[in-house]
Amino acid sequence: MKRTNIVWTALFIAIFVGTGPLPAKDSAPKDLWDRVEHHNADSSGVKIHYVALGKGPLIVMIHGFPDFWYTWRKQMDALSAHYRVVAVDQRGYDLSDRPAGIEQYAMPLLVDDIGAVIKAEGRSSAVIVGHDWGGAVAWTLAMTHPEWTQALIILNLPHPSGIQREIKNNPQQRMNSEYAFNFQKPGAEKNLTAEKLAGWVKDDAARVHYIEAFKRSDFEAMLNYYRANYPRPDQDSAALAPAPLPKVTVAVLEFHGLGDQALLPGALNGTWDLVEKDFTLVTIPGAGHFVQQDASDLVTATMTDWLARRIH
């Protein structure tokens, strides 16, 4: 297995930690919004909305918080020249269903949603791409359903065992995770608005779409991802110990914008020991949490080249 022994900073939230990423040039076609196909998948009675573009091997792209399918606008056009590119609205967001209850956002259900999308496309497997919470879903899917996974691309989300290890052992990391612990508190969603959640979006035209999508979304559902899946501050150290997880058996490409400070670099250590095939890590100085937008040209070109060598 190839090792790229570079440590990067992690997780999500430029809007709450003020990372100041690179100015983003919106190079996506202006009509991409109108050119995508809209579809729905049935995940055990929960409607999962997704958009699609292109023909060829299937790529499924999964957004994080606070986001929706449009986060991938700068990758979809280039990749769709050779692939069938699907971008999902996760449950709780935009045009997907918003089931009530914390238990409805447990990781196994989020993984099953992606399986339903793959099935709706008439395929048995796909390249899985995930950012932030979408990255957590992507890691978990690759570990628990390798038969669905042709290759894995992760953006700004460390391997789950690395996150748990750092929260357990690193006091600074626990401090940097306060935003997530606050999201777990009852009623935290009352402090959110569509406009506030879209505040990180730099492109004015794109921000309009984001505000509209967030007004269709459920803020409580968004925070239920944290309540159902993120380590809790009141857990003892034994409960925070990383559980043994299966190794990832496909090739992995991982990006990280080094301007993202919500997770410290130690969370990346040892990731190469958890992947059986080649593991490529790309760190991008000056880019923040939303690296797919902050460094869109580099991310897209790297994805295109990496996939061309592996997926035909």
Regions found by a protein language model. Name each.
Residues 26-39, 46-48, 58, 86, ...:
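Flexible "cap/lid" subdomain of the alpha/beta-hydrolase fold that forms the substrate-access gate
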Residues 9-18:
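Bacterial N-terminal signal peptides
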Residues 52-95:
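Conserved HGGG/HGGXW glycine-rich cap/lid loop of the alpha/beta-hydrolase fold
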Residues 21-23:
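Sec/Tat signal peptide C-region and signal peptidase I cleavage site
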Residues 287-296, 300:
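Catalytic histidine-centered segment of alpha/beta-hydrolase-like enzymes
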Residues 1-9:
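Bacterial N-terminal signal peptides that target proteins for export
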